[in-house]
């Protein structure tokens, strides 16, 4: 696992609470890459390429700094964290993200952009702690605790889930560099950088042949009307069992083949390539249109 804790800050709960109250009033809308999630998934841009409050698309900045949106003005504590903790010269985008009773399917980010993947640096500052919220990164499942700042290797196959209704708000700050860099350069305040903290790694059950056979038996259940539901179901398996998240798509292809529906097989292969292979900037994918 390349993802790891970068440091930890003490959150001012009173100031944070006021910001969270504002974020709760912002309407939930269709997200960029909304096909990656089900349930409650809400992203609110605080800084982005355009300064537009509805602009949720991450893209490379060309010689101009990230612009604050009107939402940034309404969350002064989070805005202070962004501008004092992080290296503003490298800031590409900052947004809050919330996930409740939902899963984000395994995927890779930055594949539609122009820089070398190692030049993108995504961080998550956890603002709230939901005990049943987890992230996965290749072969590991982690629970991010409130106040922890993580580097999330978003170029690897990764996923997120919250099995509960408890809010799990985070501040996602994306930075980018032009060449080789030291990760502590992500911070304006060098005292924040403390990468030796121990992570909360989730223990998982062994993935057995019997468990795999049970998954493949879904070929007797899957159909075009529940194809999307089966994908999200399979996306949760690796949080309980010790198996790579990328297997989600191999199971989906196999189950679709077992059902004998060529259209489903084609869609399963296409969502696999779209999520963890390559896609164009702004490209979308429908899981329900046949």
Curated annotation (Swiss-Prot):
Q: How is its activity regulated?
A: Inhibited by metal ions such as Co(2+), Zn(2+), Ni(2+) or Cu(2+). Is also inhibited by EDTA in vitro. Unlike the procollagen-proline cis-3- and trans-4-hydroxylases from mammals, does not necessarily require L-ascorbate for activity although it does increase the activity of the enzyme.
Give the GO molecular function terms. Answer: metal ion binding; proline 3-hydroxylase activity
What this protein is called in its record is L-proline cis-3-hydroxylase 1
Q: Explain the activity's dependence on pH.
A: Optimum pH is 6.0. Is stable from pH 5.5 to 8.5.
**Is Oxidoreductase among the key words of this record?**
yes
UniProt entry keywords in alphabetical sequence = Dioxygenase, Iron, Metal-binding, Oxidoreductase
Question: What cofactor(s) does the depicted protein rely on?
Answer: Fe(2+)
Concerning SUPFAM superfamilies, the annotation shows: Clavaminate synthase-like
Q: Which reaction does it catalyse?
A: L-proline + 2-oxoglutarate + O2 = cis-3-hydroxy-L-proline + succinate + CO2
Lineage runs:
Bacteria, Bacillati, Actinomycetota, Actinomycetes, Kitasatosporales
Family per similarity comment: Belongs to the L-proline cis-4-/cis-3-hydroxylase family.
Positions binding Fe cation in this chain are 107, 109, 158
Source organism: Streptomyces sp
Q: How is the cofactor bound?
A: Binds 1 Fe(2+) ion.
Instruction: Cite the EC number.
Output: 1.14.11.28
Q: Name any one Pfam family assigned in the record.
A: Pro_3_hydrox_C
Q: Name the residues that bind 2-oxoglutarate.
A: 168
Instruction: Supply the InterPro entries for this chain.
Output: Asp/Arg/Pro-Hydrxlase, IPNS-like_sf, Pro_3_hydrox_C, Pro_3_hydrox_C_sf
- Subunit organization: Homodimer.
Temperature effect, per record, is:
Optimum temperature is 35 degrees Celsius. Is stable below 30 degrees Celsius.
- Tell me the function of this protein: Dioxygenase that catalyzes the 2-oxoglutarate-dependent selective hydroxylation of free L-proline to cis-3-hydroxy-L-proline (cis-3-Hyp). D-proline, trans-4-hydroxy-L-proline, cis-4-hydroxy-L-proline, cis-4-hydroxy-D-proline, and 3,4-dehydro-DL-proline are not substrates.
